[in-house]
Amino acid sequence: MRVLLSNDDGVHAAGLKALADAFHGDEVWVVAPDREQSASSHAISLHRPLRLLEVAPRWYAVDGTPTDAVYMGLNLVLRDARPDVVVSGVNHGPNLGNDVLYSGTVAAAMEGALLGVNAVAVSLAAPPPHDFGEAARFAAALARQVVARPPPAPVLLNVNVPPGPVRGYRFARLGRRTYGNEVVEKTDPRGRKYYWIGGEGRVHNEDIPGSDCNTVLLERLAAVTPLHLDGTHDPMFQELRSWTVPGYEKEPAP
């Protein structure tokens, strides 16, 4: 099995090394950002050149975002040797609920799926110090299942693993996870103001049975969530059919 690994914590991150170890015996390729890129979401670098450095055999660093890394991996490094699966992680912390909108880990896997390769994003929902081995082994086992039973269209599975041994898992829906909506103002030594967003990192997880948040944080099970690449809000789409925009014709004839 040929595997492309990436992440958003950087090419030298311990979680990435653990993931590579979990695929021992497979043909493993790594293309990852050359530095920390957490919360970079699906940003892609279109207005500057990128550099690609081979730091070890089959192990590459890109001076860009997680999306850049997977794009380069699939369209350059492995252009003539398509991988069977893209796996992103192991992230240093959870990617639950609303986190997936900001996560570079999830975005790297999403880019793989958008480019036609089944993908898995895996995160360890535990504070440091991190032991990534169990999460990496679970992700590898799941990735092998994805390859063995390929879906009709490329799939993205978002995985969150609690600390310690994985005693079980659940296929879970996204929950709702929000942070303190604060902007912290400070002053630099030259008297100029600067800001941190997000406050002190206070997190609220809504209690939603069957959600990834409940599965991981309350029940201590691994959560596997299939993420849909079509962001259309279908209920609102139907509602909009009854709307009109004054002064404009709806669906005019060509």
Curated annotation (Swiss-Prot):
Residues binding a divalent metal cation: D8, D9, S38, N91
Cofactor binding summary note: Binds 1 divalent metal cation per subunit.
GO function terms (MF aspect): 3'-nucleotidase activity; 5'-nucleotidase activity; exopolyphosphatase activity; metal ion binding; nucleotide binding
GO annotation, cellular component aspect: cytoplasm
Enzymatic class: hydrolase
Keywords for the protein's UniProt record, in alphabetical order: Cytoplasm, Hydrolase, Metal-binding, Nucleotide-binding
Cofactor: a divalent metal cation
Superkingdom of this protein's organism: Bacteria
Record-linked InterPro entries: SurE, SurE-like_Pase/nucleotidase, SurE-like_sf
A Pfam family that the UniProt record links to this protein: SurE
Catalytic activity from the UniProt record: a ribonucleoside 5'-phosphate + H2O = a ribonucleoside + phosphate
EC code(s) of this entry: 3.1.3.5
Compartment(s) where it occurs, according to its Swiss-Prot or TrEMBL record: Cytoplasm
Function: Nucleotidase that shows phosphatase activity on nucleoside 5'-monophosphates.
Family the entry assigns: Belongs to the SurE nucleotidase family.
Name the UniProt record assigns to this protein: 5'-nucleotidase SurE
Higher taxonomy: Bacteria, Pseudomonadati, Myxococcota, Myxococcia, Myxococcales
Protein encoded by which gene: surE
